[in-house]
UniProtKB/Swiss-Prot annotation:
This is Ribosomal RNA small subunit methyltransferase A. Its EC number is 2.1.1.182. GO terms for cellular component: cytosol. It comes from the Bacteria. It catalyses: adenosine(1518)/adenosine(1519) in 16S rRNA + 4 S-adenosyl-L-methionine = N(6)-dimethyladenosine(1518)/N(6)-dimethyladenosine(1519) in 16S rRNA + 4 S-adenosyl-L-homocysteine + 4 H(+). It is found in: Cytoplasm. Its main location: cytoplasm.
Amino acid sequence: MTDRYPSPRALLDRYDLRAKKSWGQNFLGEEAVLDDIARLAAPRAGDPVLELGAGLGHLTARLLARGARVVAVERDRDMARVLRGELGDRITLLEADAARLDHAALAARFGAPAAAGEGARLAVVGNLPYHLTSPILFSILDQVAHVSRAVFLLQREVAERLAAPPASRDWGLLSVLLQREAEVSVERIVPPGAFWPPPKVESAVLCALFRPPADAVGDPARFRRLVKAGFGLRRKTLRNALGSAKLAEPARLEAAFAAAGVDPGRRGETLTLAEWAALDRALG
């Protein structure tokens, strides 16, 4: 790290702490990766950024150096103590669960309008433990109108699944839901040695730039149920998978397949985003 901010090991020693394995704590200390994440999350000075799981504050410090206005979320009281001690009132610190945030309220308080007539939004950034990735992503997707972009450090295999192309082996529920709302890309691979303590797997930086959905659906909540059902029984055909989920009467399902131009003998992972959206509209 730089002279301005101590290394992860130095901070843990200073505060007599250890990384908590049960919390998935692996602290990123590689300068180049921190700089890339901060640049992606806060391209302009003054940008409001919500950092999920701020930890020891290494990314927080980089965001501040870029002139970002940082709202740091940290549930671990030990980490919150470090953040207060090292960064003080330069940040707004919230001791809260990152998967249970009210993004509308946070955006209204700290966010910036995306364009004339649009509501306030925040960029969201964080180094997400594996076990919290899905809950946090679903929380963001439920409140996507209040998020401008998301930049996450994830396990490499998770990041690659989220950015997977349609009809590929890694194409799944979260791939469909996230890519409907955002342009998604894997920006760089991060080796275990960039962290302390080093994890056993590679990580990757994922960037999601939120924009109006490219494919309209009849009912967003039903769309999620539809896609979940289609991927829930991957070995079954769409006719059987959606029929088992009882999303509609069999005759209505058959009519929807015909109207959407989707062969009910296909499997869910073979459908593109546009085909999923067309099937949802046909069910409406």
